[in-house]
Amino acid sequence: MYGSYRKPRELIWVGGWVTYVLLCAEGFTGYVLPWGQMSFWAAQVIISLLGSIPIIGEDLATWIRGDYLISGITLSRLFAFHVVLLPIMIIAVVFFHILALHEIGSNNPDGIDIKKHVDKDGVPLDSKPFYPYDITHDIYALGVFLLIFCSVVFFFPEGGGYVLEYVNFEPANPLSTPAHIVPSWYFTPFYAMLRAVDFSLFGFTAKFLGFVTMAAGIAIFAALPWLDRSPVTVS
């Protein structure tokens, strides 16, 4: 890994981090919409985490749910978030991310600023045209992605229970808790952080400390440009 987040590209890095967080939120809200057994209980677990926040937690969780329990009101809200609010926010953040990238320029593993050596037209001497080199490179990568994506969607949608959990084919039942409430595979690292904290400390409950640990595991990536104090840009 090289210092793609180092000065002067902090804004680009943070913009990418915000995009990642919004995509996680988009994935979570979309996961709840089928209203299957695992979807229901995943929403119950995640939203109830907010209830562990001292003083305001329970009121905040009730406000987000729109009810005292996960219900159709919650589903309608998450549907609006998934279809309207979050996509608009993602498009806006990606737009500003591209603007920042256009202004500052991309990085490279050697940490060399190619803008220091330009020709009479202002084009870096050590650069290559975006077309056809990068265009053909990206088209190839896009083709490989679409091949895998379409193979899963049309021929292997369950993904052996990893893409679509079999238990989620059952309708949501608030009176029957699944034997194991597991997150989608892309949330597994953060869910592991949440479950790893099983002790109370300084008057804070284990549930709250686990929530803080999970949130910190996500937020720490945004602070990388300021945490990395090494004088060497690349590794």
Mark where each language-model region is:
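Membrane-embedded and interfacial regions of multi-pass energy-transducing membrane proteins
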Residues: 1-235
